[in-house]
């Protein structure tokens, strides 16, 4: 099952899959990519964990979203940040996965293990 995303790719990044408090951590803090995809501070989104295909998809969902885009301040500007730190990441990516390929689409972000 492939998550539904708009076909137009807005950008991509190769990032390190981190660890925080003994759990896998995904930290997305590229303002240009997040804003282009529509992920703004305070906006709600839902995460779709797909262990069978090694993929996590994030979808903007103002009504049913269970997660919120965080922010960090730089001067007077609020920059979007997505911080995912939970056990479900380990169910999607095996222990030998140390990097992730993050692809940005309008209203969606797809994260794959590398």
Indicate where each model-derived feature is located.
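Secondary-structure transition/turn motif
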Residues: 58-65, 112-114
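Beta-strand-rich non-transmembrane domains
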Residues: 18-22, 52
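A short beta-strand-loop micro-motif that forms or neighbors metal/cofactor-
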Residues: 39-56, 93-111
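N-terminal intrinsically disordered, low-complexity, charge/repeat-rich segments that act as generic
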Residues: 1-11, 24
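Short beta-strand-centered segments at strand-helix junctions
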Residues: 22-42, 66-96
């Amino acid at each position: 099952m492939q998550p539904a995303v708009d076909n137009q790719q807005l950008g991509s990044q190769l990032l390190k899959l981190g660890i925080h408090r003994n759990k896998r951590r995904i930290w997305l803090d590229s303002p240009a990519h997040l804003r282009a995809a529509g992920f703004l501070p305070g906006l709600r989104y839902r995460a779709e964990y797909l262990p069978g295909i090694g993929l996590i998809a994030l979808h903007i969902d103002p009504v049913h979203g269970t997660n919120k885009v965080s922010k960090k301040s730089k001067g007077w500007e609020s920059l979007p940040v997505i911080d995912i730190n939970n056990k479900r990441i380990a169910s999607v990516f095996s222990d030998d996965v140390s990097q992730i390929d993050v692809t940005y689409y309008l209203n969606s972000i797809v994260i794959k293990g590398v």
